């Protein structure tokens, strides 16, 4: 007798399905309507994937300089939708808990793609900067990327303009990390004095 494997599927309510579809379509108006009508900003799709991961998916698709320019409107829509979801209480860690050390957080993911404005959003909404994935924090991922850039510069097959653009974005991401860390310690010292 053949055994049939049943894939675990998570139930998705009608209003959450509308929200998920609107995010997939990058339709800000429909996202707003679904949220206003009670959709869960922390809903999961049928596979159990948190909606934040769907919202940042566009940034992994269009990575090189040409693609980023070509798909500027899509990227801007995705950023606006992500901001809206977060403002409605969506988890900036995309359902990843501190005890889950096998998965990266959305902040780590956008750092990998050097999406500074998206990283700022996650930091603004309280993303876990201390999360460790395979022994690395989001800052460790930036340092790894910086080291990788050195190897790529030594490779004569790489497009110099593309590498320069990536290095500029990496430098801006480090500046964001330093500013965030400085703000954290400033607030920590302020709280200790009180």
Question: At which residue positions do the language-model features occur?
Answer:
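Ankyrin-repeat-protein effector appendages
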Residues: 2-14, 125, 143-194
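Ankyrin-repeat boundary/"N-cap" motif
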Residues: 9-21, 44-69, 95-109, 132-148, ...
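Ankyrin repeat domain, specifically the short helix-to-loop turn at the C-terminus of the second helix
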Residues: 32-40, 82-92, 120-128, 174-183
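Flexible, glycine- and charge-enriched loops at secondary-structure boundaries
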Residues: 24, 67, 71-78, 163, ...
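Alpha-helical adaptor scaffolds
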Residues: 53-56, 74-75, 79-100
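Conserved ankyrin/ankyrin-like repeat signature
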Residues: 30, 77-81, 117-118, 166-173
């Amino acid at each position: 007798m053949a055994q049939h494997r049943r894939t675990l599927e998570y139930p998705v309510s009608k209003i959450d399905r509308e929200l998920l579809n609107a995010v997939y379509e990058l339709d800000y108006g429909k996202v707003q309507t679904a949220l206003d009508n009670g959709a869960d900003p922390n809903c999961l799709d049928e596979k159990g994937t948190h909606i934040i991961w769907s919202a940042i998916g566009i940034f992994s698709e269009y990575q090189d300089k040409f693609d980023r320019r070509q798909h500027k409107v899509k990227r801007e829509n995705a950023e606006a939708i992500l901001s809206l979801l977060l403002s409605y209480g969506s988890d900036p860690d995309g359902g990843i808990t501190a005890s889950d050390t096998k998965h990266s957080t959305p902040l780590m993911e956008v750092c990998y793609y050097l999406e500074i404005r998206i990283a700022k959003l996650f930091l603004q909404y309280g993303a876990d900067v201390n999360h460790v994935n395979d022994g690395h924090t989001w800052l460790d991922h930036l340092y790894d990327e910086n080291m990788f850039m050195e190897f790529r510069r030594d490779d004569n097959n790489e497009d110099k303009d593309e590498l320069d653009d990536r290095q500029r974005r990496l430098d801006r991401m480090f500046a964001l990390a330093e500013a965030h860390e400085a703000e954290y310690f400033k607030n920590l010292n302020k709280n200790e004095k009180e």
